[in-house]
Amino acid sequence: MNKILLKTTIIFTALFSLNVVASPLDWQKVKRPIPSEDGKASPIGSYTNGCIIGAQALPPKGEGYQVIRMNRNRYYGHPNMIQYLERLGQRAKAAGLPTMLVGDIAMPGGGRFLTGHASHQMGLDADIWLRMGEMSDADALNSDGKGLLVVDRKAQRVDERVWNSNHATLIKLAAQDPNVTRIFVNPAIKVKLCQTAGNDRGWLHKIRPWHGHNSHFHVRLTCPADASYCENQAPVPAGDGCGDELYSWFEPPKPGTSVSKPKVTPPEPFLCQQILNSPNRREWLE
């Protein structure tokens, strides 16, 4: 593949091509990482509205981890994420944990999904399953229906029949990395972690309750220091997050507050739109 002069491409496209807003289907067609001018990866936009230039693929297997759902082609990320997952796999193995199963990271160029995710668009998000232990190659290729549900949805608490200390240890190891800004889990999992963390609670503030997330947890890394076009989230609130905010997730909705407003999809970052309109796009499209 010839070296692509990204800046020249973007300027040319901005001046001479139609400014067509990309659809999720457009990003689905990106089958290879989009190369950068200088070889450095660039996350563009935000976690829920962006793309990535120079993504890398996480190898299917490494020390302490295995990539699953490979048929979806969502195992690409920023180099920081790839290195983070490799480090976490090594730490998990050193702690005596079963093989860590890595789910979706991002598509080769990032961008919006047709199904499954609102975020995971810049290669700085990754799902790690709560099922642990190596899968066969066939199951790793297509892992649908093979997850482990650790939350009793009716009781809104962790299912003690399947939850064990390995889950808590892996989440704690995942949160202790300084590049991690948030880890999303089901509110019931956060409650369990708050109850069992003991005196070492310095990592709990990163564990954020969110809808779903009852068979996996979702790691989010901070924007790299040199990423000029990457937008960080606001910092998490102070404290361990084990107080009223957490337990508010279990309260019934107040009358008159359940009316949902229609969601307005914002336009994608200009650079992401122009990448898909690039004269060189055949090099990374199917």
From Swiss-Prot:
GO biological-process terms attached to the record: proteolysis
Function: Murein endopeptidase that cleaves the D-alanyl-meso-2,6-diamino-pimelyl amide bond that connects peptidoglycan strands. Likely plays a role in the removal of murein from the sacculus.
Organism whose genome encodes this protein: Haemophilus influenzae (strain ATCC 51907 / DSM 11121 / KW20 / Rd)
Family matches, as SUPFAM superfamilies: Hedgehog/DD-peptidase
Binding site for Zn(2+) 1: H117, H120, D127, H218
Taxonomy, superkingdom: Bacteria
A GO-annotated cellular component: outer membrane-bounded periplasmic space
The protein's name: Penicillin-insensitive murein endopeptidase
Subcellular location: Periplasm
Cofactor(s) essential for the protein: Zn(2+)
Gene Ontology molecular function, alphabetical: metal ion binding; metallopeptidase activity; serine-type endopeptidase activity
Family in the record: Belongs to the peptidase M74 family.
InterPro entries xrefs: Hedgehog_sig/DD-Pept_Zn-bd_sf (IPR009045), Peptidase_M74 (IPR005073)
Enzyme Commission numbers on file: 3.4.24.-
